[in-house]
């Protein structure tokens, strides 16, 4: 009985102790609909932008002209050009909340 009366204040203190704060967003792979949902969550009413067609149209003719002229890429040793977009940042690799915010309007 004496042990119980000694442990009661300690148990009450442990019961009232707040839990450690949880991390709201962990760096993770986000692909497809999960990536879109994360953008909606991060950007909210601001919305987000994604214009892949406009980028391809701008880069397409220049790459073809360089290959025909014997410029970089003509020999085929360099491989495909590296892409720098949200899919490469968040799906192929892990991305943070701050990287997602870069795509908000």
Swiss-Prot record:
Q: Which domain of life is it from?
A: Eukaryota
Q: Which GO terms describe its cellular component?
A: extracellular space
Molecular function via GO: hormone activity; identical protein binding; insulin receptor binding
SUPFAM superfamilies, alphabetized: Insulin-like
Q: What does this protein do?
A: Insulin decreases blood glucose concentration. It increases cell permeability to monosaccharides, amino acids and fatty acids. It accelerates glycolysis, the pentose phosphate cycle, and glycogen synthesis in liver.
Enumerate the InterPro entries for this protein: Insulin, Insulin-like, Insulin-like_sf, Insulin_CS, Insulin_family
Q: Which Pfam families match?
A: Insulin
Species the sequence originates in:
Bos taurus (Bovine)
Gene3D superfamilies with a match to the protein in the record: Insulin-like (1.10.100.10)
Would I find Disulfide bond among this entry's keywords? yes
Q: Give disulfide pairs as residue numbers.
A: 31-91, 43-104, 90-95
Propeptide segments, given as residue ranges: 57-82
Q: Which GO terms describe its biological process?
A: estradiol secretion; feeding behavior; glucose homeostasis; glucose import in response to insulin stimulus; glucose metabolic process; negative regulation of apoptotic process; negative regulation of appetite; negative regulation of lactation
Q: Where in the cell is it found?
A: Secreted
Q: How does it assemble?
A: Heterodimer of a B chain and an A chain linked by two disulfide bonds.
Q: Which UniProt keywords apply?
A: Carbohydrate metabolism, Cleavage on pair of basic residues, Disulfide bond, Glucose metabolism, Hormone, Secreted, Signal
Q: Which family does it belong to?
A: Belongs to the insulin family.
How far does the signal peptide extend, from start to end residue?
Answer: 1-24
Principal localization reads secreted
Name recorded for this polypeptide: Insulin
SMART domains, per the entry = IlGF (SM00078)
């Amino acid at each position: 009985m004496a042990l119980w009366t000694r442990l009661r204040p300690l148990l009450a203190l442990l019961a009232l102790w707040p839990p450690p704060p949880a991390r709201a967003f962990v760096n993770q792979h986000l692909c497809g609909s999960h990536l879109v949902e994360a953008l909606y969550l991060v950007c909210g009413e601001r919305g987000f932008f994604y214009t892949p067609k406009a980028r391809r149209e701008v880069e397409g003719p220049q790459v073809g002209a360089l290959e025909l002229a014997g410029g970089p890429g003509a020999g085929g040793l360099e491989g495909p050009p590296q892409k720098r977009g949200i899919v490469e940042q968040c799906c192929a690799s892990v991305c943070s909340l701050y990287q997602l915010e870069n795509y908000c309007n």
